[in-house]
Amino acid sequence: MIQTKRLQYFLLLILFTLFFLPFCQTAPNSSSGLPQLHLMPWPSKISLEPGKLRMDSGFHVTFKGHQEPRLLRAVDRFNHSLSNQTGIPLTSGTEADVQMTPLEVHCKDPGKATQSVRENESYTLRVSSSRAVLKAPTPVGVLHGLETLLQLLHLDTEGFFMPAVRIQDEPRFPWRGLLIDVCRHWMPMEVIKRNLDGMASTKLNVLHWHLSEDQGFRVECKSFPKLHEMGSDGNYYTKEQIREIIEYARDRGIRVVPEFDIPGHTTAWFVGYPELASAPGPYKIERQWGIHDPCMDPTREEVYTFLDTFVGEMAQLFPDEYFHIGGDEVNGKHWDANPDIMAFKKEKDMKDNHDLQAYFNERIQDILQKHGKKMIGWDEIFHPDLPKDVVVQSWRGPESLAKTAREGYMGILSNGYYLDHVLPAAYHYQVEPLSGDAADLSDKEKTRILGGEACMWAEYITPETIDSRIWPRAAAVAERLWSSQSVTGIGDMYRRLEVFDLKLDWLDLTHRSNYPLMLQRFVGEHSVEPLKTLADIVEPIKYLTRGSIRQYTQMTPMNRLVDAARPESHAARKFQNMVDEFLADAPDHNANKERIREWLMRWRNNHEELKSVLEESLLLQEIVPLSEHVAALAEAGLQAMEYIEKKQEAPLSWTDGVLPLLSPPQKPQYELIIVILPAIRTLIETARNPLVSEDFEDGEAQEWEPNIPENWRVGEEGGTLCYRLTVPGTQGKVRAPTSWSLLQDFDVSCLIFTGRARCESPIDNPHRDMVIVFHYQDPTHFYYVHFSASSDELHNIIGLVDGKDRVKISLESPEGSDARLTDMKFHDFKVTYNAETGDIKAYFDDMKTPILTATDKTFGHGQVGVGSFDDTGSFDDIKLWGKIHK
């Protein structure tokens, strides 16, 4: 799991890129006088030419070469969509009058009856002022070309038109998929169909249909009817509906790959057939999320007889050459608890459960081969004894993908493409299948990487919200898998994505239309605008953090603001751009000044407008603190702008007062994050620049001076770089912290020192600690804050070292000092010192309320640093504000 700090760093990098690098590695675009194109994914080769092909009721399609019903239906859809978007009635069919403006479609061959992985998807497109010509070797290429034509539609003062253009296009990867989980929350037919339409518009070509899980079995099975009768709550697809979806997908150039997850994630199978399980029943449908113990018994022949019959029936239903067996997250607890299974492992000389699962997979591979299918599964299925036509789907990352390719196996990447993590489109866009270890593969090995899949797992979605969690961000994944590896410009991607987002409405996707309806649900008869003002600048908390904040089950209502909020805020991204331009316009700072002030005033005043509605709505009461926080942030932003415009440095006391606003709770009950916060942080830190701002991502620590240099280094921790104390120190003559590293060029009086700290000592050590050293004079004269796992007279204190053993100067009793360093996580800290009053305050996690306080004027100034008494640990995201001592 990627750490929060890494995500924060990446988000800031995205925001920097959006403003400072808008034209770096972008898709090439039009010259002056010609329209900007918004194609997504961007074609392999494209050139704009003078001229425009006007759209009117005479626009018509003619065929040359191969024709088939699938192409005729595609043309009907094309005409229908074009007519909807322009309001111009267009005639269906392909019979044309010579006076009509033609779209000539040249299809060379019929293609395969069942679309294959390596089927030719290329096409060429030539649009001139008199006609358009689309050529493709197969119907699939024609389908892609028609989608490109629809994206070329523009409007000017004379009406609708398509710009004159030459396009030669083909995908970089042949496998470009979207996984839809219909088990954890049921998804009706109409959800699947409209998302297939969205997939077609972005040239995604594989629907990975996750059809069985602990929480549900979703396909009618004639051979074993208790699978769907007892394992689905009545929510399953009939065979006829499955065939309808497969045909619907084929009409759009999309393969359908079913996934029936085995041997784990199989609780729903066992409700009707407990004899398949490794532990005795009875079983019931699982309502909780997570990794569960039930799994199939891989030692019993009856299990394979059952699966042989099952696979045979499903192989007849699903025509694709691949059959996904899942194979992930088998914890093996029920295997270890079964004496017969343990005896089987011993008899077969199996070292562990991985060997046992490999045996199971080999047996399943034989069954699949018998029924004409090739195996695909998650990382866990990989074993050197498997046939080379097996495809491994990697959720672990490029390293795992590269290893698979080196061993001669084909693979697809999903790590980094999990849409249910509600990360920005730019995050997914920068996940490159041929990066990391995969970049070092030979050309032959690289061909084994077939592509990737975006994943939409269904723990926290419903039919009402699924579209908003897939679109438009899935288009960023689609472009990464289709377009040239050199097309990487984030700013240009967002420019095109915003237009593409609007066009998705024509496909009846609900990602935009359901948003105002869900907000209206919260406010009843009241105006929705104040709530929308707030909702537009928040996003759901990232990754799967929701499950660590409250208990969710399959029956939990998904009717809170976190469910309505969009995964990515357009308003926040636009606001960040405006702030960046404002700050770059030095020294006058006139750019966007009035617009920024207007937006900040609206957010500041919004809470008063919304307050009465929040108090009256049960569904909104939890977000009162969120609304208050936004108002306070906006006020701080306005104050920061005033300091910046007047060219005045903000007082240190003001900075101390607003900094808590920049540290929202890490796991808020409302499960939302305020995404205008980074832009307002920029304003605040410009109003009073920190003396030091260090995240160690450059791999350097040149500003730091350790007392024992060999004990300190910059290293990776949880996927991010930080400053690590790797060896504990030894006590000297004076009892005091033994290891520290100081900011060497800063001698300050008043100070604010913030960052994150992580102790690496075992959790059962009651004296585990990290310290903040300040007003350091020499090794036996300084203050320190001791953050510890326990509280007593000398632990979890503010201490003074004045030429002798340290003494406690903090006012809190041992019972009242609130020791919190009790886990292996990073924790926020803040230490402040007021040189005029001698007041010292130490904060831990909660930046509003200090856990330790003291008053002392022994040392009025000195250096600042981090360290420990006798532990190891890590520090990150260090910032220092202060007054330089004269």
Give residue ranges: language-model regions.
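Flexible glycan-contacting loops in extracellular carbohydrate-active proteins
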Residues: 851-877
